[in-house]
Amino acid sequence: MYRIYTSLLLFVTVALFGQEPGIIAENAKVTQAGTGYAFTEGPAVSPDGSVYFTDQPSDRIYVWNENREIALWSDDTGRSNGMYFDAEGELVACADLHNQLAYFDSDKKRHLLFENYEDKHLNGPNDLWIAPNGDIYFTDPYYHRDYWEELHTEAQDTRGVYHLSSDGVITRVIDDYKQPNGIIGTPDGKTLYVADINDGKIWKYDIRPDGTLTGKTFFAPKGSDGMTIDEQGNIYLTMGKVWVYSPGGELIQEIE
């Protein structure tokens, strides 16, 4: 058995049944782990199995542990949104207060990782995935935030998806979406899934050795605010409910 964490603080236990239709254990149920947040986002599982999530308008990151306890982890997050742990166990976040990618050290101090493309600030990084080789893929849509300063505008000429190599080279790898959002890759680092949420589609790509993308293929007729993947390669899409798709693009389960 293993756990899939969905919809931020709505947890469901699932079981592996190969390619059989339905992957949810017969006695599984969705439970609410916490309440009282302004707007939760960005669940990320740490190496020890704890789940970190943000309350973005409140500029906070919380952690849920194996004892089913929730504790404040940081109240200086740069308005973190999507998050992911790297191979060293450091938490990397899309911090859109100043349109940045940031990481947190072991003392919970936030550090700038990246903030500009072609001498212009990003629109507002939303979600990210870190490949096994340390490369980062992140989506950069534009959602106006009430807490942004008046001069904070949509600076980029497209709402794109970017590749940040482990040696610091940035490349825009997708430029034809209406509004990119959720993103996830396979554990072998060979395949990337990206949601165009405003177009209601998930696209699948092959990842080249240099980190660029090829072989754009339609995967699912859904937009998705966030995505994850299980050990069998099934993709979990979230927006109102959770849709589970097989690696071949077959809808195999709905969770609500």
Regions found by a protein language model. Give the residues of each.
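Hydrophobic h-region of N-terminal signal peptides that target proteins for export
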Residues: L10-G18
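Sec-dependent signal peptide recognition
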Residues: Y2-L10
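Sequence-structural signature of mature extracellular/luminal beta-sheet repeat domains
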Residues: G18-E256
